[in-house]
């Protein structure tokens, strides 16, 4: 009965089950709570672990449509009817590969990188492509789009070269046509439609140079002071602030809208062969896909998130940013472990653990020969207390190292800040030069050091309580390790000395009585009258 009660006490409860992915966080939570750490009052930034809704998408602003940079990836296919022009065709292809730095060298990875993403807010611009036999990348509903540009689904672009034009870079004779809702665009003359392109745009862009007299203002996205302009000769967007000067921003090498429209078409290269008169000989087709070069930006197509759009894509997409589900844990939690409740985790059936049973049997066996089992259990608890104290020391050292790194980084940042303020002193400092809010770092390293000092004091207190007590259990156990092997023989000898004489006397009486009984039985069988053993023979 006592053994059964011990097993019931030591067997862990099977009702609750913690997810196996969080053992380290659970141990950290228990450690901080058991030591009364002041870090339990801090707020923790948490992210959701759910794979069904990994995050939220936010659309890019109209101005970001003009500044986010895209890049192209070109794949080519030789025409099966190519005749006699392999050498000049290879020459043209090598020229394209060498002279286009805005072309992506490594092949992109297609396919959604996130699924089940919800778009928050209204996208200022969406692009729709409807291609037969195209690759569907997802479709946003029209209700979440302010302005939707639709790429002409019937347009196919070709370019014809003569045999002496192979050294020239191929260009689209015109960009893929896009349509837009009536009344969305207004004719405006602005030098901003020429943009302020970086060095690669003017030399390697796929379209003809822009004409600032053919500039259209997107009225739905513009205000009195700020205009969003569309250049239809290059399918490029520009942002203009009427209250500022011309040096406002630079146009990327490949804009997002241009890349998205280029990826819906292909460039067919043909040549007039000098060997076959004036007949056109197809050489190869350029199939172009597009990716976002700006880090952190993605194509949002319905609930699918892409980093690259394949050639001949179809669907409705915008651009934006993706953030995981972020929330703040309550301040009274040391770590956000309770957020993962048991109701959200799968229950697992487990068999009864035999370790507590064996521990109980070991303690009972120890009590049968002495106090070895109780001594060992007490020593185990003492060692556990020491391990906790050592863990606290390790954590305090890690926090100290992290704080030293933060202090060092803060010193470097502040030094750079002073240098930037000196360089931009004529403009009022770096904050005024950037026209942004000034941000400052509040040094709270003193609080962190005080908390670390408290942790070290608590660790010392735990270690002292573990080493103190009756006979100092650690030293006592070393002495018991020598005595325990002799306990069995000593106990056996003691029992023999205590009960040996009594056992010997009982054995002697038993043997004597048996001998008398045998002698009496012998006399009766011989026919002699048995003599009374009590009377005297005389």
UniProtKB/Swiss-Prot annotation:
It comes from Gorilla gorilla gorilla. Residues 500-538 are cytoplasmic. The keyword Coiled coil does not apply. Residues 1-15 form the signal peptide. A motif (CXXC) lies at residues 43-46. Residues 354-374 are annotated as: Fusion peptide. One of its GO terms (biological process) is syncytium formation. It is found in: Virion. This is Syncytin-2. SUPFAM superfamilies: Virus ectodomain (SSF58069).
């Amino acid at each position: 009965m006592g053994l059964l009660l011990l097993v019931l006490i030591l067997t862990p409860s099977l009702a609750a089950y913690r997810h196996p992915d969080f053992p380290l966080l659970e141990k950290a939570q228990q450690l901080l709570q058991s030591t009364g750490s002041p870090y339990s009052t801090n707020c923790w930034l948490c992210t959701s672990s759910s794979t069904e809704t990994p995050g939220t998408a936010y659309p890019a602003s109209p101005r970001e449509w003009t500044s986010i940079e895209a890049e192209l990836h070109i794949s080519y296919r030789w025409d099966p009817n190519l005749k006699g022009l392999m050498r000049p065709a290879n020459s043209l292809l090598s020229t394209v590969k060498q002279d286009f730095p805005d072309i992506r060298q490594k092949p992109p990875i297609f396919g959604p990188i996130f699924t089940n993403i919800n778009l928050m807010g209204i996208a200022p611009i969406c692009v729709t492509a409807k291609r037969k036999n195209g690759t569907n990348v997802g479709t946003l509903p029209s209700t979440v789009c302010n302005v939707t540009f639709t790429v002409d689904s019937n347009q196919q672009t070709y370019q014809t070269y003569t045999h002496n034009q192979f050294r020239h870079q191929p260009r689209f004779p015109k960009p893929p046509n896009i349509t837009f809702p009536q009344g969305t665009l207004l004719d405006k003359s602005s030098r901003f439609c020429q943009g302020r392109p970086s060095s690669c745009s003017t030399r390697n862009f796929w379209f003809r140079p822009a004409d600032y007299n053919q500039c259209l203002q997107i009225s739905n996205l513009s205000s009195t002071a700020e205009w969003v302009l569309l250049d239809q000769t290059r399918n490029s967007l520009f942002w203009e602030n009427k209250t500022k000067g011309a040096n406002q921003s630079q146009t990327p090498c490949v804009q997002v809208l241009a890349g998205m429209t280029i990826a819906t078409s292909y460039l067919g290269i043909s040549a007039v062969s000098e060997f076959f008169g004036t007949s056109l000989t197809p050489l190869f087709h350029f199939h172009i896909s597009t990716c976002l070069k700006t880090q952190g930006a993605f194509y949002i197509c319905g609930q699918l998130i892409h980093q690259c759009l394949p050639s001949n894509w179809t669907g409705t997409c915008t651009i934006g940013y993706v953030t995981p589900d972020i929330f703040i844990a309550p301040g009274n939690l040391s770590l956000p472990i309770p957020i993962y409740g048991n109701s959200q985790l799968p229950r697992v059936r487990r068999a009864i653990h035999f370790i507590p049973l064996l521990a109980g049997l070991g303690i009972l066996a120890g009590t049968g020969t002495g106090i070895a089992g109780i001594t060992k259990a007490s020593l185990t608890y003492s060692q556990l207390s020491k391990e906790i104290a050592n863990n606290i020391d390790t954590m305090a050292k890690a926090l100290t190292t992290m704080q030293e790194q933060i202090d060092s980084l803060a010193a470097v940042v502040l030094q750079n800040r002073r240098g930037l303020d000196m360089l931009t002193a004529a403009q009022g400092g770096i904050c005024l030069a950037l026209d942004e809010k000034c941000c400052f770092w509040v040094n709270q390293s003193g609080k962190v050091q005080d908390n670390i000092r408290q942790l070290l004091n608590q660790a010392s207190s735990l270690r002292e309580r573990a080493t103190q007590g009756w006979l100092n259990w650690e030293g006592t156990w070393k002495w018991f390790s020598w005595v325990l092997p002799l306990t069995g023989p000593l106990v056996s000898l003691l029992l023999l000395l205590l009960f040996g004489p009594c056992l010997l006397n009982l054995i002697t009486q038993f043997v004597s009585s048996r001998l008398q009984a045998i002698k009496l039985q012998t006399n009766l069988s011989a026919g002699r009258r048995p003599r009374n053993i009590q009377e005297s023979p005389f």
